[in-house]
């Protein structure tokens, strides 16, 4: 992940490079802000550097955060996970005022699937592809203090994006005590989900 910032015109850019598990395709995602718009440009190439996909997306500033990109083992598609802030969710009594959306981008079209966070706070959600399934993982909180309460899990069909399974699994009280501790300086600083495949 390469970041660069240009302060004179209030613009910035991010470049992300991703290779599929079979090492037969790679993707480049370029995100940049300029003025009131945020833009994302996606490319997919095979190993002979033949361009398979080029797609552009544009959003109002501060409404969308790109979380991750993922590639299929065999299909020529890019999966883009985004966190989307919605004005319709401003009056929610509890939980985050946003939802997640996963886009399946091919050379001919874009499919989308909306993932609601319900009454939880889900600061981050990342998807990875294994065979014909997409798996999403993220830590969630039940309170606005963002102390993690458990792990959110989603299983989607990688072709249709149909949600096959979803679950919010809460941590045990002992784990929460170990994580946050009785005393501030005794808490566990970070929890990391390692590569699972």
Tell what function each PLM region has.
Residues 1-8, 57-61, 113-119, 160-193:
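Surface-exposed loop and turn segments in beta-propeller and other repeat-based domains
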Residues 1-8, 98, 108-135, 139-144, ...:
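Asp-box/WD-like beta-propeller blade repeats and closely related beta-sheet repeat scaffolds
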Residues 8-17, 61-71, 119-128:
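Repeated scaffold domains used in trafficking and secretory/extracellular systems
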Residues 16-18, 22-35, 43, 69-70, ...:
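Short beta-strand elements that form the blades of beta-propeller/WD-repeat-like
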Residues 29-57:
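Beta-propeller domains
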Residues 39-50, 93-109, 148-162:
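Beta-propeller blade signature
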Residues 72-76, 106, 130, 159-160:
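A short, structured loop/turn motif at beta-sheet edges
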Residues 133-134, 141-144, 152-158, 179-197:
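Peripheral, non-catalytic segments that deliver or gate enzyme domains
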């Amino acid at each position: 992940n390469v970041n660069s910032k240009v302060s004179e015109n209030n613009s910035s850019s991010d470049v992300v490079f991703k290779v599929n598990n079979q090492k037969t395709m790679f993707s480049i995602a370029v995100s940049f802000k300029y003025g009131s718009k945020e833009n994302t440009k996606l490319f997919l190439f095979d190993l002979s550097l033949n361009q398979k996909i080029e797609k552009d997306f544009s959003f109002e500033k501060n409404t969308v955060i790109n979380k991750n990109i993922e590639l299929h083992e065999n299909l020529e598609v890019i999966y883009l996970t985004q966190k989307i802030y919605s004005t319709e969710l401003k009056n929610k009594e509890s939980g985050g005022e946003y939802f997640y959306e996963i886009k399946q981008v091919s050379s001919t079209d874009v499919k989308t699937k909306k993932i609601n966070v319900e009454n939880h706070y889900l600061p981050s959600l990342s998807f990875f592809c294994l065979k014909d399934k997409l798996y999403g993982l993220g830590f969630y909180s039940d309170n606005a203090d963002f102390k993690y309460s458990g792990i959110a899990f989603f299983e989607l069909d990688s072709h249709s994006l149909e949600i096959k399974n979803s679950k919010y699994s809460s941590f045990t009280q002992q784990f929460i005590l170990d994580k946050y501790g009785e005393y501030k300086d005794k808490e566990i600083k970070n929890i990391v989900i390692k590569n699972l495949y």
